[in-house]
Amino acid sequence: AGHMAWMERASAGAFRICTTVDDLRACLSNGTISGIMHMEGAEPIGPDLDALHLYHAMGLRSLGPVWSRPTVFGHGVPFRFPGAPDTGAGLTQAGKALVKACNRLGVMVDLSHLNEAGFNDVARLTEAPLVATHSNAHAVTPSTRNLTDRQLAMIAESKGMVGLNFATVFLRPDGRQSPDMPWDAVLRHLDHLIAKLGEDHVGFGSDFDGATVPQGIGDVTGLPALQDVLRAHGYDEGLLAKLCHRNWFAVLDRTWHPPR
């Protein structure tokens, strides 16, 4: 949080921490780089949740209760291939309180890295759409980190969202980390997610934080190449705009609100 605040101060207006969808739209229209403060793994927040309110005041608007390990809030899925996300117990009492507090504050709860029992608990408790910011289809790549068709159906019912993860271990049908892979695997995941969720509920989740990604993408500068591949695959400009930003704006608009 402090580093993002420093980036905003040091950028001379080129970077902005966004806490509303109007902020995001303004940045898109004027060319400002926008950032959403997200916490992956809620270890910095204790079970009393006092720190959650401090982070929210600093701009936190998206939170994953766990990374792929246990916390005081729940259990993350270990990285296994092949494997299923049914890997342990659900949310703790502190985890359930965290979901409710996020709902009251208007903080999006991220289901990526959460095991199946925890996913089910969030689905029962939350008042917001179900969102997995960087996960793929288990039916295509049977990794513990990917979402089963049953989970996708629950996300669809909530009018939620899945962001496609570019990490090769979650894209390749063999679960390997190698970046040398055809575009076909990316297309299979996107086609499956759109078939299960509808084109209004899928976007890009990237995971550009050190994960091995397809060599055709490489980093954020490879996104235009991905768009060209999707055009050749038959995706029209309207669908590309949804995948790139419109669907994220829409689900955040349904999730973010002033504290209540």
Where in this protein do the model-derived segments appear?
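Histidine/acidic residue-rich metal-binding segments in metalloenzymes
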Residues: 47-57, 79-131, 144-158, 184-200
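Short acidic/histidine-rich active-site segments
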Residues: 166, 196-220
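Active-site environment of divalent metal-dependent phosphoester hydrolases
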Residues: 23-24, 44-45, 69-74, 114-120, ...
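Conserved, mostly hydrophobic/aromatic
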Residues: 20, 59, 109, 134, ...
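A metal-dependent hydrolase metal-coordination microenvironment
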Residues: 1-49, 68-73, 77-89, 93-96, ...
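A conserved active-site cap/scaffold subdomain adjacent to cofactor or substrate pockets
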Residues: 161-170, 175
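Structural preference for beta-strand elements that scaffold enzyme active sites
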Residues: 16, 34-38, 61-62, 106-108, ...
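Mid-to-C-terminal alpha-helical segments outside catalytic/metal-binding sites
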Residues: 218-260
